[in-house]
Amino acid sequence: MVEDSQETTHFGFQTVAKEQKADMVAHVFHSVAAKYDVMNDLMSFGIHRLWKRFTIDCSGVRRGQTVLDLAGGTGDLTAKFSRLVGETGRVMLADINDSMLKMGREKLRNIGIVGNVEYVQANAEALPFADNTFDCITISFGLRNVTDKEKALRSMYRVLKPGGRLLVLEFSKPIIEPLSKAYDAYSFHILPKVGELVAKDGDSYRYLAESIRMHPDQETLKGMMQDAGFENVDYYNLTAGIVALHRGYKF
């Protein structure tokens, strides 16, 4: 589902003014930043690591290239890209939320990743980079939180080099009906309780479940990427469509 009008958008199942959403999302991630990695492992049973590995494998990133890990949070993808691009390459970890960015910087520095990684607080809708800067852009579990997704996709297209590719890893729509019902039960009844127990914030994980349901489905997101200028757009359903990886190119 896309935004309802030019003035309003959705925050989970709520309809809010567009200018309010960024602050509301920021509050969510300020709240959960300290327990973000732990909760990712718990709520996905560790499978998020396989989804991210598949994203890396599909990226085609090589030594010496320049990568933007957008909404990069605690740096899972940045850590892997740093090793792939080597000393002659560069990885930019960008996130709109300073709490998440600080967690990512601390985590990566603690494991010795310092030489080829830079950090920037940035809004996906207005990326502060020159045209044709990056060989690859990834946005992992971040697009659904963006207020104006179409504007963000156009911004990503602008800063990609010709021949570059965008990979969007995001929760999507299960393709098996019995799984969809079980997933709803888990998302709305169990996940907020786990969030309350571990992160002391059930409301933020209730928002997570709602934001997933409001996010465009596989075919809709494919069309949005094409409308932004991307070509050869395809997607892969992971874990029966609970998550999908979309990939598109700039030629």
Curated annotation (Swiss-Prot):
Pathway: Quinol/quinone metabolism; menaquinone biosynthesis; menaquinol from 1,4-dihydroxy-2-naphthoate: step 2/2; Cofactor biosynthesis; ubiquinone biosynthesis. It catalyses: a 2-demethylmenaquinol + S-adenosyl-L-methionine = a menaquinol + S-adenosyl-L-homocysteine + H(+); a 2-methoxy-6-(all-trans-polyprenyl)benzene-1,4-diol + S-adenosyl-L-methionine = a 5-methoxy-2-methyl-3-(all-trans-polyprenyl)benzene-1,4-diol + S-adenosyl-L-homocysteine + H(+). GO terms for biological process: aerobic respiration; menaquinone biosynthetic process; methylation. The keyword Transferase applies. Its EC number is 2.1.1.163, 2.1.1.201. CDD domains: AdoMet_MTases. SUPFAM superfamilies: S-adenosyl-L-methionine-dependent methyltransferases (SSF53335). S-adenosyl-L-methionine binds at residues 74, 95, 123-124, 140. Coiled coil: none annotated. It comes from the Bacteria. It comes from Klebsiella pneumoniae subsp. pneumoniae (strain ATCC 700721 / MGH 78578). GO terms for molecular function: 2-methoxy-6-polyprenyl-1,4-benzoquinol methyltransferase activity; demethylmenaquinone methyltransferase activity. Keywords: Menaquinone biosynthesis, Methyltransferase, S-adenosyl-L-methionine, Transferase, Ubiquinone biosynthesis. Belongs to the class I-like SAM-binding methyltransferase superfamily. MenG/UbiE family. This is Ubiquinone/menaquinone biosynthesis C-methyltransferase UbiE. Methyltransferase required for the conversion of demethylmenaquinol (DMKH2) to menaquinol (MKH2) and the conversion of 2-polyprenyl-6-methoxy-1,4-benzoquinol (DDMQH2) to 2-polyprenyl-3-methyl-6-methoxy-1,4-benzoquinol (DMQH2).
